[in-house]
Design a protein with these regions (language model features):
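N-terminal periplasmic/intermembrane-space "pro-region" immediately following the signal or transit peptide
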Residues: 5-8, 14-58, 409
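Outer membrane beta-barrel
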Residues: 39-186, 220-224, 311, 366-368, ...
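Sequence/structural signature of outer-membrane beta-barrel proteins
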Residues: 60-66, 98-102, 131-133, 138, ...
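Solvent-exposed loop segments that connect transmembrane elements
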Residues: 181-206, 244-246, 278-301, 375-395
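Detector for outer-membrane/organellar transmembrane beta-barrel domains
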Residues: 212, 222-341, 407
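Outer-membrane beta-barrel "beta-signal"
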Residues: 312-314, 393-409
Length: 409
């Protein structure tokens, strides 16, 4: 009976069936590159102060191959993003503000910082939480499993210290609270009362957990040789998991290892993540899953409380000096897998093959993605994909074509 109640609740929510996703930002351009209109850049005469205002305007084409979707070959507005960066002597700031589809807004990062020297600084506000591959856990436009579990482009309100030289990269963070759900760019564990505008009451209304007092640590070492460079790193995160119903604190922790290998035109990135949530739920609420959500751009969803995630991404750069404005094409394969602890909850998998075209200020991604037991793929048909795989489309592979075109300034 529970299976059919869950399915009914998810079908009700299918109107929002993951039609949108945040999508990654553009790669950083060298400071010497003059950015196009309407980019604003100002430097003081003494070089002690600066202001840069840039951003992007993007549209998205999506063709999804499952019954409940409305995106059967549709061009839609994706985002208008503003990036504001400023410096004054040792002080600096960085804010990314997104105007997204369906009238949503989000902040992917927003902080002020103080630079102690060329190697170390501290950031206060909403910096990225240091963990694993940074900032994006894949090459393609289509986010993969680590992102949906909260391990990619994830900011929190707090403080971060960073030290980086040619060999070492050390980051330490403390985040008393997560970003408010209404402006989250990336998903995070949340209470139903904060996510109820885009959640399913049948299955999620008693979910009342949120993370508090999270600490993060990430350390990476870079090794270089003749024509190659490799980064190897490890990450840890831990937090209280406060339940507003019981007023008790559960626990959360995660650990990960990652590697980035560059050799010629090839880049290979990989990571393994182990996470565990131990909630203090009231009687009658299962501890096997917790609720996650963002700003409502996609529906809130349950994830397995304990799981292991693995991913590997392979990219190859093709430089095109004879093709005019088109300077580079990156082709890539992204693969990720989520292995849940609970018996009978089958693995979730995602696989993307695609290409990124850099003809700045125009940039485009073309992604072909297959996914199994992954909520964004299949919508209500696959709505329990991150947990018990009891939806109509569980253990079926779903396919999506996505083309994103943006003007970056």
């Amino acid at each position: 009976m529970n299976k059919y109640v869950i399915s009914l609740g998810l079908i009700i929510s299918s109107a929002a069936s993951f039609a949108s996703e945040p999508g990654p930002a553009a790669p950083d351009q060298p400071p010497a590159v003059k950015k196009p209109f309407p980019h604003i850049a100002w430097r003081s005469d003494d070089g002690q102060s600066s202001l840069d205002i840039g951003g992007a305007l993007r549209v998205n084409y999506r063709d999804e191959h499952w019954d409940t979707t409305e995106n059967n070959g549709r061009f839609l507005f994706d985002t208008f993003r503003l990036d504001v960066q400023a410096t004054h002597k040792q002080l600096f700031s960085d804010v990314g503000y997104w105007f997204q589809d369906d009238g949503k807004r989000s902040i992917d990062r927003g902080y002020v910082g103080y630079r102690f020297n060329t190697n170390s600084n501290v950031q206060l506000g909403a910096p990225f939480k240091p963990f694993g591959l940074e900032p994006y856990p894949q090459f393609g436009w289509s986010y993969h499993i680590p992102f949906f579990m909260g391990y990619g482009v994830s900011a929190g309100t707090g403080l971060k210290y960073s030290y980086k030289d040619k060999d070492w990269d050390l980051q330490l963070g403390y985040f008393p609270r997560m970003l408010p759900s209404g402006i989250r760019y990336s998903p995070e564990v949340g209470r139903y009362s904060d996510l109820d505008d885009n959640a399913v009451a049948f299955t999620q209304s008693r979910q009342d957990n949120e993370k508090r007092n999270q600490v993060n640590a990430r350390v990476a070492r870079t090794f270089t040789g003749d024509g190659w460079k490799t980064e190897i790193g490890a990450s840890l995160a831990a937090a209280e998991l406060y339940n507003a119903t019981t007023r008790d604190d559960g626990d959360y922790w995660a650990g990960g290892v990652h590697a980035i290998v560059n050799a010629g035109n090839w880049t290979v990135t990989s990571q393994a993540i182990r996470y565990e949530y131990d909630p203090e739920n009231p009687d009658g609420v299962s501890n096997d899953s917790v609720l996650m959500g963002g700003n409502g751009l996609t529906p809130a969803y349950l994830i397995a409380s304990k799981a292991t995630i693995g991913s590997i991404n392979v990219g190859y750069d093709i430089f095109t000096p004879s093709l005019g404005q088109l300077k580079k094409i990156k082709v890539y394969n992204d693969y990720s897998r989520m292995m849940k602890d609970k018996s009978g909850w089958d693995d979730s998998q995602m696989f993307t093959v695609g290409a990124q075209f850099l003809a700045m200020p125009i940039m485009a991604w073309v992604d072909f993605t297959w996914a199994k037991n992954a909520n964004p793929f299949g919508g209500a048909e696959n709505g329990t994909g991150w947990t018990n795989t009891n939806s109509v489309g569980s253990n079926d592979w779903y396919y999506r074509t996505n083309i994103n075109i943006g003007y970056y300034f």
